[in-house]
C-alpha cells in the first residue's frame, strides 16, 4: 500500500471520532413533562437555547420560563404550523430537535462560569460569552444585601488601608504599643461560604414533590386553583386541587396534569385566561395538601358555581357537597 493510502486511515479515524463527539454534545435531554409558563430547570435551559439558536428567543438563558420564553414558544409554533398554545409538548420538542441544535456541554459551562449570553445560535463559540459574574449579580439580587466578595478589588479597596496600618503600628519601637485588633481577624467579614456555589450552574432546578409530580405540575395546578377558587375558603381551594388529582386517577380523563387542566371546556380559568395569573402561596399550599392525601371534595371529579352555571348537564350530576360557592359532584 502506498504512503498516501496509509495516511488516509488515521485521517478517516479522526473524522469518525469528531463526528461521534459532535453527536454526543448535541444530543437532546428533554424530559417527558409538558413545559409551560412558570417552569424552571434544565428543560427550560434547553428550550431557550434551541429557540435562541434559530432566532426566536433573544433574552438571557436562565432556565426560567417567563413571558419572553412564552412568546418565543408561541411564535415558533405559529411559524411551524403547530397549535399556538404556549405549551411545549412532544410535538414541539420533536420539531425543535429537527430544526435546531443544542450543545449542552457548552451551555452548561457558560452557566457554570456565571456568564450572561444571548447569542447561542449562528455565532462562533469563542465569542458566545457575556461579562463574567452575572451569576453572582443574580445571586446577590435574590439574597438581599451581602458582604463584598474578596475577589472583587474594586469593592474591597476601602478595607486595604486598615490591613496595612495595623502592621505598621506593631513595627514602631514604642515601649507600650496601644492595643489594636489582630490583623488576621480583619478579613473575616469577607469570608463567604456561599462562594462555593460558583462551581454549579446558576439554574433553578425543577423539584420533584410527592407522588413524582414535578415543580412544573405544581405550578400549573396552583395557577388553576388560583384562577378557579381564589377568595374561596382554604378547604375549598384544596377541594379544587383534589378534583384535578381525582381526574388524573380516572380513566375518563387525560393522564397528565397539563392534559387535565387544558382539556377543552374543562376549566373556566383556561377559557377566560385567568390560568396565566400568578398564583399566591395559599394556592400552592392547597395543591401540596391535596397531593399529600387531603380530599375535602369527597372524591369529586366535577364542581360548579350554581350562581353562574348554565349547563343543564352539570346540574344532572350526582352532588356530593357544597364548599363555599362551589358544588362538588361526580
Curated annotation (Swiss-Prot):
Domain of life: Bacteria
Signal peptide residue numbers: 1-29
Compositionally biased tracts (Basic and acidic residues): 134-173
Protein known as: Spore cortex-lytic enzyme
GO terms of biological process kind: cell wall organization; spore germination; sporulation resulting in formation of a cellular spore
UniProt key word Protein biosynthesis: no
Phylogenetic lineage: Bacteria, Bacillati, Bacillota, Bacilli, Bacillales
Organism: Halalkalibacterium halodurans (strain ATCC BAA-125 / DSM 18197 / FERM 7344 / JCM 9153 / C-125)
SUPFAM superfamilies according to UniProt: PGBD-like (SSF47090)
Amino acid at each position: 500500500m502506498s504512503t498516501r493510502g496509509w495516511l488516509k486511515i488515521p485521517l478517516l479515524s479522526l473524522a469518525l471520532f469528531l463526528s461521534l463527539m459532535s453527536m454526543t454534545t448535541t444530543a437532546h435531554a428533554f424530559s417527558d413533562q409538558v413545559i409551560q409558563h412558570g417552569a424552571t430547570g434544565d428543560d427550560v435551559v434547553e428550550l431557550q437555547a434551541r429557540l435562541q439558536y434559530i432566532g426566536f428567543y433573544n433574552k438571557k438563558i436562565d432556565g426560567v420560563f417567563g413571558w419572553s420564553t412564552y412568546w418565543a414558544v408561541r411564535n415558533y409554533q405559529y411559524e411551524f404550523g403547530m397549535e399556538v398554545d404556549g405549551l411545549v409538548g412532544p410535538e414541539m420538542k420533536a420539531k425543535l430537535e429537527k430544526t435546531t441544535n443544542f450543545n449542552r456541554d457548552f451551555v452548561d459551562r457558560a452557566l457554570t462560569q456565571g456568564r450572561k449570553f444571548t447569542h447561542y445560535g449562528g455565532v462562533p463559540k469563542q465569542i458566545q460569552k457575556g461579562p463574567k459574574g452575572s451569576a453572582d449579580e443574580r445571586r446577590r439580587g435574590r439574597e438581599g444585601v451581602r458582604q463584598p466578595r474578596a475577589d472583587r478589588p474594586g469593592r474591597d479597596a476601602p478595607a486595604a488601608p486598615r490591613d496595612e496600618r495595623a502592621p505598621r503600628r506593631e513595627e514602631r519601637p514604642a515601649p507600650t504599643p496601644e492595643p489594636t485588633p489582630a490583623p488576621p481577624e480583619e478579613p473575616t467579614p469577607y469570608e463567604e461560604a456561599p462562594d462555593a456555589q460558583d462551581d454549579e450552574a446558576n439554574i433553578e432546578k425543577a423539584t420533584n414533590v410527592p407522588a413524582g409530580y414535578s415543580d412544573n405540575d405544581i405550578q400549573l395546578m396552583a395557577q388553576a386553583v388560583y384562577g378557579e377558587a381564589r377568595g374561596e375558603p382554604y378547604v375549598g381551594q384544596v377541594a379544587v386541587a383534589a378534583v384535578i388529582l381525582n381526574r388524573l386517577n380516572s380513566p375518563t380523563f387525560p393522564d397528565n396534569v397539563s392534559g387535565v387542566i387544558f382539556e377543552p371546556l374543562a376549566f373556566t380559568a383556561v377559557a377566560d385566561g385567568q390560568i396565566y395569573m400568578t398564583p399566591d402561596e395559599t394556592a400552592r399550599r392547597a395543591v401540596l395538601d391535596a397531593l399529600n392525601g387531603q380530599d375535602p371534595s369527597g372524591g369529586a371529579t366535577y364542581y360548579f358555581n350554581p350562581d353562574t352555571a348554565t349547563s343543564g348537564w352539570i346540574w344532572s350530576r350526582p352532588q356530593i357537597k357544597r364548599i363555599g360557592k362551589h358544588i362538588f359532584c361526580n
